[in-house]
Amino acid sequence: MRWYHSQMTQYHIAINGFFWDKPTVGVGQYVHGLVTALATFPDLRITLYVPADTTPPTAPGGVTITRLRSPFSGRSKNMAKVMFEQLAIPAAARLDQVDLIHVPNFAPPLSSRIPVITTIPDLIPLKRPAYRGSLRVRAYTALVQRAARNSAQLLAISTTVADDAARLLGHARGDIDVTYLAADPIYQPDQSTDDIRTRYHLPASYIYYVGGHDERKNVSTVIRAYAALPSLLRQQYPLVIAGKAVGTNPVLFPDIDALIVQLGIAADIHRIEVTRDDNPAVYGGAACFVYPSCDEGFGLPPLEAMACRTAVIASHAACMPEVLGDAALLVDPFDISAWTDALTKVLSDAVLRESLVTAGSVRAAMYSYQRTAAATHAAYMRVIAGQRGQA
């Protein structure tokens, strides 16, 4: 519904806020960054729909949070999520007379009287069989795959994802817009590294990894490459691994602790659970950051490390070359000896390390959520104008 204030047309946008209370995961970071930036557009009135059984963080000024109950709330977590996406949001949007629904993850409603824009963060479940192993997951994937085809507009967070979406969802590539992500503003050089080292029992110098532990993250490659370093170099630069597996399926979540013990390098590896607020300082205290993932939609951690002025070694798979350019040392994700060589070079060559720091800082500054929001706003306006033209 169009609202008028001081002669300005204002459009009502409803956003699926399922991940609003999950700011440490990629989609949650995207939603927070996007909504915060969109709130500065005077021609938008934004309503964020969140599940009724969550305690959502405060929204930016001008953004309304509406809590929606759905069938299965408080009973089945998975079914409650599906009903929230498929029934509660379209119904609320219709009652609220919104102009557009934006679903910022791969979870669009199959049927909606209100036009839907869907952002595709990645299509991992369609590309990698291990991620759709159960019947429930396969059924859900088929549902949202079909629903995505009904979206008025698809957005993708990288050209890599846009190409995947054209191939796997049947959309014309020219109809899919790319809206890049960005590192959150909290990721910048932090002077509190000494305090963080004490709190997390970190060594003076270290190699850092933070991210998922599922199989596509390929953490075992870095562990094996690290084990091949000379023992003196390992002692000088322990490997700090943050995060943990969130499942028990050994195919999806390889046992990296068993691998560490098997390789005899447990004394040189530190396992930590780091908070979001402390993560910038942990990045900043590292000699380098490693990211061996073999499949990503965007890959925020390397960009966060760059924003914190830390040298990055990453895989050259999927979107990594697109996002990181020549500001990171890019390596074949499965070539263990190449990873060992890359680690040796970066740790032993201060000039190379500083050049990566400088290039990375420039690269990270190329991305911002204000740019993401501007591209998203343009998509909103095109879809709304198209709907008005059909009326």
Where are each of the predicted segments found?
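Carbohydrate transferase catalytic cores enriched for Leloir-type hexosyltransferases
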Residues: 1-391
